[in-house]
């Protein structure tokens, strides 16, 4: 049996050498914003876990967890353009969060993207430079988006 102090020592040792949480991106390769965010993550020195959410949608529980971590209303995660949003009548303010989640589970294209998860937080990264707020190393230098816009972020502490 280990003593209390041995547990404290082991716990402290593990904290010192803790492996950082990997960066995860819920990605749609057909989306320019999502491609820009992925490129910014890589330029920061991270190789993220890439979840192509249209091929591998999050579970309902995971989606609820992401929404809670972003501290946004469910409705704010809905994508309108290029989706069945209008046909499904999702602009109806009477629809509950559960009904909106049902729609996103049935039609993952309704989930706005990209969502990025890091040890510093979870964000819907629109515009793409929003990702810099949660990257472990946001000092990526000058970055040129696909549309030619140059982003010159400063390191944030």
What do the PLM-derived regions correspond to, one by one?
Residues 1-20:
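N-terminal amphipathic/basic-hydrophobic helices that include classical n-h-c signal peptides
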Residues 6-8, 25, 84:
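Intrinsically disordered, low-complexity N-terminal regions enriched in serine/proline/glycine
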Residues 9-11, 33, 127:
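Residue-level detector of bioactive/disordered segments in secreted/extracellular proteins
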Residues 15-19, 42-44, 60-62, 79-80:
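A short alpha-helix capping/helix-coil boundary motif
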Residues 18, 22, 149-150:
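Detector for intrinsically disordered, low-structure N-terminal pre-sequences
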Residues 20-44, 48-53:
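Local sequence-structure signature of Cys/Sec-based thiol-disulfide redox active-site neighborhoods
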Residues 53-157:
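Thiol/selenol-based redox catalytic cores and closely related redox-interacting motifs
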């Amino acid at each position: 049996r280990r003593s209390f102090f041995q547990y404290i020592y082991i716990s402290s040792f593990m904290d010192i050498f803790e492996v950082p949480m990997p960066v995860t991106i819920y990605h749609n390769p057909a989306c320019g914003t999502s491609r820009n965010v992925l490129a910014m993550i890589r330029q920061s020195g991270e190789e993220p876990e890439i979840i192509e959410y249209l091929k591998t949608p999050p579970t309902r529980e995971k989606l609820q967890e992401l929404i809670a971590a972003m501290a946004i209303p469910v409705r704010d995660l809905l994508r309108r353009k290029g989706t069945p949003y209008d046909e499904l009548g999702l602009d109806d303010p009477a629809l509950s969060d559960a009904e909106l989640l049902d729609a996103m589970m049935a039609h993952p294209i309704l989930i706005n993207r990209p969502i990025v998860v890091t040890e510093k937080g979870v964000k819907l990264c629109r515009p793409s430079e929003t990702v810099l707020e949660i990257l472990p190393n946001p000092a990526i230098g000058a970055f040129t988006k696909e549309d030619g816009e140059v982003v010159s972020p400063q390191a944030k502490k």
